[in-house]
Amino acid sequence: MRGSVYYQTGQLTEAIFVEGAKKEDRIDPDHLHYKCMASYKSMKTYRDVWNNLGNYLKEHWKLKDFEKINEEHIDAYISYKIEYYPSKQYLEKIVSALGKLEDALKRFALIQYGAERDYDFSIRQNKLHYAKVQKLVANGYHNRVYQNPVQIIENLSNDHHKVAALIQLYGGARSEGVTLIKKDQLKGIAIDPITKEEVGIIETKEKGGKIGDVMIRPYVYEWLEEYFQYDERFKINYQAYADDIRQTCLRLGIEPHGTHGFRWTFAQNRVRIYQDHGYTYEQALQGVSWEMKHFRASITEHYLGG
């Protein structure tokens, strides 16, 4: 499918929206209107989500064709939304909209090509369930910054988890940037352009193929260098890592914010570092956004409660 994001979601809306379609027909597998939508309000709500998804995929995955969306893209998009600690209702709306997108793509293919294409976005329900169980959704805005992150890290039960958390805390990496690190990702010691202090550089490739440098404390970098003398890969299990953080927080009487809490803490601390070195608030937001592999400065503001 070609055209702008808005044009493509319009085409999909035409495929799935039937004004006046009866409810009994929309739930009848043998009816022409099966799984169609008839509410203008709901259709607009879902299309807004589709537009947001399309812009996300265009920015992060360089994907411009809705017909090429697959399960991996849906997984990444929901993970991206969970980063910002959404409300339960908002995440449920996104998941419902993505389910209807699957239906719309199938109907569009049937109309255009005479046969349905195989789309399966069922992972969205698993992501929603996981987010609820792990308390990654909120009833409103909730700051996920750790007040004493070092205490948490020092008390983690696994040394590899400690290293991963330190990289997230001091480098702002996403979880997928620390669960697997290869030897050739180490790029040496450099100078932090803001503080003018020495830092270790790790090149990470995160969801969507975004490649960029993560700056970490020299002692963490040296630990990795020594580790790679004996192993080609530093690898941890994400679920075990997240569980270790959660159990450690509960044991210490600290509210757990998951692995991403370290990334939130990095954002807040890094903005302050920029300002301490003479940068304006707006310059700090943009600089930190780039370091966190975002383009828009406004995204960093979310981590600060803005």
Where are these regions (language model features)?
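N-terminal DNA-binding module of tyrosine recombinases/phage integrases
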Residues: M1-Y40
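N-terminal core-binding DNA-recognition domain of tyrosine recombinases/integrases
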Residues: R26-A131
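DNA breakage-rejoining catalytic core of tyrosine-based enzymes
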Residues: K127-V150, G208-Y219
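Basic, Lys/Arg- and aromatic-enriched nucleic-acid-binding interface segment
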Residues: R144-S175, E282
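A short, glycine-centered helix-capping/turn motif at helix boundaries
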Residues: I167-L180, I273-Y274, M292-H294
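Conserved tyrosine-mediated DNA breakage-rejoining catalytic core shared by Y-recombinases
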Residues: L180-V220
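Active-site/catalytic core of tyrosine-dependent DNA strand-transfer enzymes
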Residues: M215-V271
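C-terminal catalytic core of tyrosine-transesterase DNA break-rejoin enzymes
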Residues: T265-S298, H302
